[in-house]
């Protein structure tokens, strides 16, 4: 039985005052979510501050991105995997659709980052997903297969035992639109099936989160699906009550 995992992606939001308020709210109810893994991923500049605000042992810390380079060096503006580890991160989000679309990250870039993260002892949260145009033109499966295959080619299928996958339909991110529970389940089952062709044992163990406008009012239905193992939460993770409610919905499964 896979443990459900809910991670909050704060994106480029927050300051010390708002983070203190948010984390105080999370700490107050962190023990109410049941047997659920919970993490928050603040902006890099606030990682250390957030860690110091979090109640030890209840909520894990993650980065939103990291450098492709495996060692520190002359890479202005970048954050290395070792730096994320040094401030207490366990996870790092890689391949988010915003990184792909806005910053031009390729499948090969993301695959290299996944390898660097794994080699550094971080658990990558690998984001995959299709645009509305790709879905409507029947390319959903080929797009997601290509995204997965790039990483499998780089690290091998066995390494996926240490990877979290987040399916994020690009058309449902920040739009208020959500894939139906059945639509999401169908894609999650497809992802697991693709991995199972190479290693059924690893496929069964891999946590596959759903990311795409998850809210307290739709979390239970999404998380009740057999191949949906939690969520990568954007906007709702900036509200302590909403994020805790989503985590509680995971804990009730």
Swiss-Prot record:
Active site per the UniProt annotation: 96 (electrophile), 168 (proton acceptor)
CDD domains per record: TIM
Sequence intervals crossing the membrane: none
Enzyme Commission no: 5.3.1.1
Gene3D superfamilies assigned to the protein according to its UniProt record, in alphabetical order: Aldolase class I
Pathway note: Carbohydrate biosynthesis; gluconeogenesis; Carbohydrate degradation; glycolysis; D-glyceraldehyde 3-phosphate from glycerone phosphate: step 1/1
GO biological process, one term: glyceraldehyde-3-phosphate biosynthetic process
Catalysis performed (reactions): D-glyceraldehyde 3-phosphate = dihydroxyacetone phosphate
Pfam families: TIM
Gene Ontology MF terms in the entry: triose-phosphate isomerase activity
Protein family (similarity comment): Belongs to the triosephosphate isomerase family.
Protein role: Involved in the gluconeogenesis. Catalyzes stereospecifically the conversion of dihydroxyacetone phosphate (DHAP) to D-glyceraldehyde-3-phosphate (G3P).
Name of the protein in its database record: Triosephosphate isomerase
Species of provenance: Hydrogenovibrio crunogenus (strain DSM 25203 / XCL-2) (Thiomicrospira crunogena)
Organism placement in taxonomy: Bacteria, Pseudomonadati, Pseudomonadota, Gammaproteobacteria, Thiotrichales
């Amino acid at each position: 039985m896979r443990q459900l995992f809910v991670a909050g992606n704060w994106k480029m939001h927050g300051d010390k005052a708002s983070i203190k308020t948010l984390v105080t709210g999370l700490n107050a109810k962190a023990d109410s979510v049941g047997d659920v893994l919970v993490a928050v991923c603040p902006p890099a500049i606030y990682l250390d501050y957030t860690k110091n605000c979090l109640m030890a042992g209840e909520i894990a810390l993650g980065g939103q991105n990291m450098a492709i380079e495996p060692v520190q060096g002359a890479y202005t503006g970048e954050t290395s995997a070792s730096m994320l580890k040094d401030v207490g991160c366990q996870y790092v989000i890689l391949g988010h659709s915003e990184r792909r679309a806005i910053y031009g990250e390729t499948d090969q870039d993301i695959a290299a980052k996944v390898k660097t993260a794994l080699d550094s002892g971080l658990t990558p949260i690998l984001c995959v997903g299709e645009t509305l145009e790709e879905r409507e033109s029947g390319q959903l499966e080929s797009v997601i297969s290509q995204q997965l295959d790039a990483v499998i080619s780089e690290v091998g299928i066995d390494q996926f035992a240490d990877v979290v996958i987040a399916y994020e339909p690009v058309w449902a991110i920040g739009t208020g639109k959500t894939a139906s529970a059945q639509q999401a389940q169908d894609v999650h089952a497809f992802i697991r099936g693709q991995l199972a062709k190479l290693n059924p044992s690893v496929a069964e163990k891999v946590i596959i989160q759903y990311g795409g406008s998850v809210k307290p009012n739709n979390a239970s239905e999404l998380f009740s699906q057999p191949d949906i193992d939690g969520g990568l939460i954007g906007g709702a993770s900036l509200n302590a009550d909403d994020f805790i409610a989503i985590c509680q919905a995971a804990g009730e499964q």
